């Protein structure tokens, strides 16, 4: 019977573990951070040129270097971004995208409009 007495204390600990497990269960669905690349262009015409290059098979990093007006030297790599650190439409799009690779990119089409311009977004990781 003593284990049951300890179980009372353990139940409280179990509830805390359950909450932690719930948080872990939620993480894979949407995650709290995404590893993002983007191509940012102020003009719609320029971002559509970049989109055509992507569709013709040019690597995302190369198109970003050529067209993006932000972080171009890193191939558009923004690194890990957390929820709340991105502007609304960009964040919504980034967390909605599946994880992709340079060889099989999945990106926003049409581009996402924010106060900064037009973004083509690609997600390389989620955690």
Curated annotation (Swiss-Prot):
Main location: nucleus
Cellular compartments annotated: Nucleus, Nucleolus; Cytoplasm, Cytoskeleton, Spindle; Cytoplasm
Disulfide bonds: none
PROSITE patterns with a match to the protein in the record: PPIC_PPIASE_2
UniProt similarity note: Belongs to the PpiC/parvulin rotamase family. PIN4 subfamily.
UniProt GO MF annotations: DNA binding; peptidyl-prolyl cis-trans isomerase activity
Name the record gives this protein: Peptidyl-prolyl cis-trans isomerase NIMA-interacting 4
InterPro entries xrefs: PIN4 (IPR043323), PPIase_dom_sf (IPR046357), PPIase_PpiC (IPR000297)
Pfam (any one): Rotamase_3
Keywords recorded for this protein, A-Z: Cytoplasm, Cytoskeleton, DNA-binding, Isomerase, Nucleus, Rotamase
């Amino acid at each position: 019977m003593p284990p049951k007495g300890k179980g009372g204390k353990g139940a409280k600990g179990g509830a805390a573990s359950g909450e932690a497990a719930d948080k872990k269960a939620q993480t894979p669905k949407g995650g709290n951070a995404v590893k993002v690349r983007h191509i940012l262009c102020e003009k719609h015409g320029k971002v559509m040129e970049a989109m055509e290059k992507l569709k013709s098979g040019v690597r995302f990093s190369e198109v970003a270097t050529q067209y993006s007006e932000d972080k171009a030297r890193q191939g558009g790599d923004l690194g890990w971004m957390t929820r709340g650190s991105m502007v609304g439409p960009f964040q919504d799009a980034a967390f909605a995208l599946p994880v992709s690779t340079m060889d099989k990119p999945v990106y926003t089409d049409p581009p996402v409009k924010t106060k900064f311009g037009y973004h083509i977004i690609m997600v390389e990781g989620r955690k």
